Regions:
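Asp-box/BNR beta-propeller blade signature and adjacent active/binding-site loops
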Residues: 1-371
Length: 371
């Protein structure tokens, strides 16, 4: 198998986090991430980008992709849709709390570079979910009843806090922010996975007109299921894999049979999760890969898992990172036109922070870790 990796920029003293990655039609890669003195509380946070020309060894100097001065611009994702429109999604944090996130997007058709794409449109993903407070309260009640005694006090405090926010119209509509790239289904529908830190669950923004207008799916209410990555099975079923944000220590998973409008129960996959982001992609071979921290504690191990049965089992695992310390996390993963798999992730070590890009193939994953 093939594998190569490099840092996108030299280790940097500031906070650099949450990458997106896309392959452009000419074969170059474009990566996005945010940089600043912190996260939601830092008003100097901007969205940066860098390019890797096809066949090149080094990435370009970083350039600005988005900056709303005075506001933190956070989690990024990039996407090239079927019509070759380039999308950048990211949230602007209005009051330095995640619950005030408003997801913005920019589109471009002139993106060959150098530097930032020429943006031709900027908009907001305005969402008005159908009132979900009754359903959420019902699910909270049954979830609480099933909570083991040792976690009961923590769960009660968590649900009390969420309960107060459930009836608030503004909080139901604000705070839905992106992390993983959208999925374009075979019908052409855009499915943008979003999550709320107010409620600690997820929701999809759906567009059937190429992103001109967006509407909210029914929320995926599992309390502690955030940052979904969505993959489509051959039969059209959508599967959402989510970061665990509660006490279960496993990847959360839900399925939709109607293109993301409604979702079944949020369950757990047989994959460990320490409360960190993951991403997945359906390969040209029909196999699926998931890039995730495969521990219950810490982010110093980053794995690629491969499934041959569309996510039912994950028999092959190989590590991008398995270190004693550091954080290697928040991956974004795509497959290029030539079959190469590209994973980009936040790379935090003692000396600073960067994004790391790894390029590999399916054979490399199958071979497993070197002894």
């Amino acid at each position: 198998g093939r594998y190569r990796a490099e840092l996108v920029f030299p280790l940097d003293a500031q906070h650099n986090h949450a990458p997106g990655v896309v392959e452009l039609p000419d074969g170059q890669l474009l990566v996005s991430w945010y940089r600043g003195s912190g996260e939601r509380k830092a008003d100097d946070v901007v969205v940066l980008g860098s390019r890797l020309a096809k066949g090149a060894a080094a990435w370009s100097e970083p350039f600005t992709l988005a900056d709303n001065p005075g506001f933190p611009d956070c989690n990024t994702c990039l996407f090239l849709d079927a019509s070759k429109t380039l999308w950048l999604f990211w949230p602007i944090i209005l009051d330095n709390g995640w619950g005030s996130a408003l997801t913005n997007y920019r589109t471009s058709h002139d993106y060959a570079g150098p530097g930032a794409p020429v943006w031709d449109w900027q908009g907001v993903v305005w969402l008005k979910p159908a009132d979900f407070q009754d359903r959420a309260r019902e699910l909270a009640k049954s979830r609480l009843a099933a909570t083991p005694e040792k976690d009961r006090a923590r769960a009660e405090a968590f649900f009390t806090e969420i309960d107060a926010a459930l009836g608030d119209k503004l909080l139901q509509r604000l705070g839905w922010q992106p992390r993983c790239k959208p999925t374009q289904t075979r019908s052409g529908r855009l499915v943008l996975p979003l999550y709320s830190d107010t409620y600690s669950f997820s929701l999809m923004a759906l567009s059937d007109d190429g992103g001109k207008t967006w509407r909210a799916s029914e929320p995926l209410i599992g309390f502690g299921n955030i940052q979904p990555a969505v993959l489509e099975r051959r039969d059209g079923t959508l599967v959402a894999y989510m970061r665990e944000n509660g006490t279960l220590e496993k990847v959360r998973v839900a399925e939709s049979a109607d293109g993301g409008e409604t979702w079944g129960e949020v369950g757990v996959a047989d994959l460990a999760n320490p409360g960190s982001g993951l991403d997945g992609v359906r390969l040209a071979s029909g196999h699926w890969i998931l890039v995730h921290n495969d521990t219950v504690d810490g982010r110093s191990s980053l794995a690629v898992s491969l499934s041959e049965d569309e996510g039912r089992t994950w028999p092959f695992v190989r590590h991008l990172e398995r270190q004693a310390s550091g954080s290697y996390h928040y991956p974004a993963v795509i497959q290029g036109a030539d079959g190469t798999i590209h994973a980009v992730y936040s790379y935090f070590v003692e000396g600073g922070k960067s994004m790391k890009h790894a390029a590999f193939d399916e054979a490399w994953v199958r071979a497993g870790d070197a002894p």
